[in-house]
């Protein structure tokens, strides 16, 4: 099998999905991300994604293993007008 390295440019929900994919894929190589899911990305989860010595520790909770803190989500609505999907340093208007 060819090894896979899922690339992640989204937040912690997609991160949790990639972690679950990685744990059940025998040809998984590395989990690639542009973020560490800290700050707001940790606050929006009731239990943040856990890291130890550079490794993600998969959740033992059911499903994706995460639960959103909806109070945090409501307190931080998305108000921007652009979606940053490129490797540019600044958001695109």
Segments (PLM) and residue ranges:
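Shared catalytic-loop signature of beta/alpha-barrel
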Residues: 1-63
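Extended hydrophobic packing segments that form well-structured cores
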Residues: 64-93
